[in-house]
């Protein structure tokens, strides 16, 4: 996978937010309602935009693993999530490398993991209910995608993918 700068991710984030399918976000919201606590692995997390986009629509207790090969982007994610939490009146603290963002009805735990995902997700033995992959699948091989779906199946995890482009255009009059 290619590296991206935080500046580039900043430029595309408003368009990415607008491009997310609201019906899929609604389905995630409904699905997450079955869980008291949802455990999410965000692959290719970048600056954490997927968390910021869908976490408010999910259950009140969530644990996120933001996984990216770039420690620089993960550092940016921590900074941006702190600002995001402040804007939502969530208190923020760090306990043993686990970031906590807590509000009246929300409780988010976030761990930042620097991993090279070139061969697929690395299993750390953590419980995973949902895997998110945003703007990544168009950068990886068919084999990588097959490994991802196999990993999700083995974990019993749901898979949310978005913002992927296959390079094809279709026009109709």
Where are these regions (language model features)?
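Short conserved loop adjoining the S-adenosyl-L-methionine
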Residues: 119-125
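Class I SAM-dependent methyltransferase SAM/SAH-binding core
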Residues: 54-119
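Conserved S-adenosyl-L-methionine
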Residues: 44
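A conserved beta-strand element that flanks and buttresses the S-adenosyl-L-methionine
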Residues: 132
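A short, conserved alpha-helix within the catalytic core of class I
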Residues: 139-152
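Conserved class I S-adenosyl-L-methionine
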Residues: 160-173
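Glycine-rich SAM-binding Motif I of class I
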Residues: 48-52
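Class I SAM-dependent methyltransferase Rossmann-like catalytic core
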Residues: 1-35, 47
